[in-house]
Amino acid sequence: TINAQDTYNVNYDASSNGQLTYFACYADVTNQIINEGSTTYNLSNLDVNSDLINTPGFCNNRTNYAGWSLYVIYENSNLPLNQINLFQGLEIINSEVQEKTIILDNIDVLDNDNAKIGFLAWEGDNALNYGESLSINGNILSNPPLNLPDNAFNGTNTFTNSTNFYNADLDVYNIENNISIGDTQVTIKM
């Protein structure tokens, strides 16, 4: 059994659907992975059915799903050294909330050669009624044809080149020209 160590909530006033609270949780499962090793892992009992039944606004708002992800960060002395910063949280972007600025602090850029940034966004949509750009330090990111400059979270997956990653979006962008050695923060604007 794994319990959340951190929980992130976003309250959204969905007009006629009332206030909806979205959440994301985080747990460090490093020890479990080390103890179990290379094997098949199963996730079970992620049940949000009672939340959907008791709050019909989620279904009416077409945001009735749950998901999970596992980030694996490992060390291999045969590979080049990489600097990794992992940030977690939850924000909402939609037709009413079209812009967010996120400041990532406590970054110490040692090298920007081949630097990348990745995003996992839930509820990625290909067809939007407004633009959805993503910028790092004032520079709009894109990696066409998968991620155009005006639809960053479009239900795609950079790793598999999938264009039908329904209800999610997993993308990695090269940002070596958007950060500099010695930078201690990054400004993300969505």
Question: Where do the protein language model's features map onto the residues?
Answer:
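Composition- and surface-driven signal marking solvent-exposed, interaction-prone regions
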Residues: 85-86, 129-135, 145-147
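A short beta-strand element within beta-rich, extracytoplasmic domains
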Residues: 1, 111-124
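Active-site lining segments that contact anionic ligands and/or coordinate catalytic metals
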Residues: 112-117, 131, 183-185
